[in-house]
Design a protein with these regions (language model features):
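Glycine-rich and polybasic anion-binding loops at the starts of cofactor/ligand-binding domains
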Residues: 1-184
Length: 184
């Protein structure tokens, strides 16, 4: 077994065992994508410094950490956002907490009709065909073990679709927060 993969195997098993409750479960291509991520990570394990993309990053400390699936986003309000001035910028604000889109913290009023900002979980359940041309298409999972691990645990996130010819009047600002707590 590759370095680092044995330590993560219980978490991979947990993800695959729980995958039936993940968004989009039962949709063939989504199930296959998650399985491909788990298989690719299992074949490689944690990246090592001898891997070209990771030569300056030592991930050995991760081998000693215990992980568990996040069961939701902890209570975070607008005042908790980093740098209060960030929340006041003239942008379309998108907030993701622990990998989950938080519509209550977003400021998307005025987006054109041909622009959709949605939670990945919602799209995986309601419109998986809209995601199929994109998910799992940019990289080879066998070459990117951390992306493979992330793919095995695919549950939520955010997606932005912009129609042809659309030019926004202000930028989309993504604020991604990782928060510890009971839900993390």
């Amino acid at each position: 077994m590759p370095d680092g993969s044995g330590h993560m195997q219980p978490y991979l098993d947990q993800a695959l065992d729980g995958a039936a409750s993940f968004a989009g479960a039962g949709t063939g291509w989504i199930d296959a994508l998650r399985r491909a991520g788990a298989d690719a990570y299992g074949a490689h394990g944690l990246p090592r410094r001898r891997d070209e993309y990771w030569r300056y990053t030592n991930l050995n400390a991760l081998a000693d950490e215990e992980f568990r699936l996040a069961n939701g986003a902890p209570a975070i309000g607008l005042p908790s956002l980093p740098h209060k001035s960030v929340a006041e910028l003239a942008t379309y604000r998108v907030v993701v907490v622990n990998g989950r889109l938080r519509p209550d913290l977003c400021a998307l009023g005025g987006l054109p009709d041909d622009v959709l900002v949605a939670g990945l979980e919602d799209l995986l359940n309601a419109a998986p065909a809209r995601l199929e041309p994109y998910l799992g298409k940019i990289i080879r999972l066998a070459d990117m073990p951390m992306a493979a691990l992330n793919t095995a645990f695919l549950r939520d996130g955010m997606a932005v679709f912009v129609g042809d010819g659309i030019v926004l009047d202000k930028p989309v600002h993504l604020i991604s927060i990782t928060a510890l707590g009971e839900a993390a």
